Amino acid sequence: VLPVAAQSVIDTDNAGLTANEVIITVKGQKVPVYRAQPQGKTNLPVILVISEIFGVHEHIADVARRFAKQGYLALAPDLFVRQGDPGAYGTVAELMKEVVSKAPDPQVMDDLDACVAWARDNGGNIDRLGITGFCWGGRIVWLYSAHNPQVKAGVAWYGRLVGNKTPLAPVQPIDIAATLKTP
């Protein structure tokens, strides 16, 4: 007998999809990106799927596959690749201190720009670009929507609007909220 939560876990299959890791090089750094898209299709709308602090794990990959099943080219980049493996830390406090707080916002924006360029060159239609993210990734949704005017829609799942400004995270979503043009 499984706990109720385990009984309701969604596990989207790969049938009809190309779903695998691709490597995108950003300023000399190889960034792993989980890609899911309908097999043999091009001119696909593009959705960037941004993880919470735990990185690209099975749930994030599953979300990408769900979007692919709906006809999207979904990309979930490992935005912490330079800082370390989020799964290697025993507590959230350690993870925040050693990995998340060390990921500079400009680096994250560059990585996402590179994902968009890769999508454009690999069957994606970036005139139909969206972004969604969870918790830490929700914050990134706000920032990237302000950064890239090509974003047509953004959905932040419980992303923080306010936070401590640091040299690596100098702007918070509340600072740019009034200027956003993206729904």
Annotated model-derived regions:
Residues E21-G124, A169-P173:
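Serine-hydrolase catalytic machinery in alpha/beta-hydrolase-like enzymes
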Residues L73, R128-G130, A153, P183:
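Proline-centered loop/turn at the N-terminus of a beta-strand
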Residues G133-G137, V141:
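Gly/Ala-rich beta-loop-alpha elbow adjacent to hydrolase catalytic centers
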Residues A153, G159-P183:
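The feature captures the conserved acid-bearing segment of alpha/beta-hydrolase catalytic domains
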Residues V1-T25, Y34:
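An N-terminal hydrophobic leader/cap segment in hydrolases
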Residues L143-A153:
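Conserved hydrolase catalytic core segment
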Residues I131-G133, W157:
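Short beta-strand immediately N-terminal to the catalytic nucleophile in serine-hydrolase-like folds
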